[in-house]
Amino acid sequence: PQSVIHSMVEFKDGGIIAQLGTPDMRLPIQYALYYPHRRYLGGERLDFAALRQITFEEPDMETFLGLPMAMQASRAGGSMPTVFNAANELAVSKFLHQEIGFLDIYDIIAQSMERHKVIENPNLEEILAVESETYQWIESRW
């Protein structure tokens, strides 16, 4: 609810490392772009004294329909996360360009995942091909 935890990783020993920051996606995006290096980012810093506590809730799978699909893609593994990501990227772009409605985003992702036959251990060439095929399939239908 405070929107300050941008990512967490749990290790096999049970330890968890989290990236925290102000409710602003610039920091996690910058981290992803420049990893393993760190760059200066101006702006507000997270103030733990003002924050006082961090609370957690179960995710609302009915409101955030993309979350169970992302979890399904992760469990399926192989090339399925590529399909999820490609379908999500293109569907969101189509929504932002007013080519589809908001709820169509979820239909596009679900249908893209349903039709995909998972490649268990894809190499880079296969991942790029799956991404391209997913884009082409969506473009031909929406």
Identify what each model region corresponds to:
Residues 1-142:
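Catalytic, metal-anchored helix/loop core of enzyme active sites in primary metabolism
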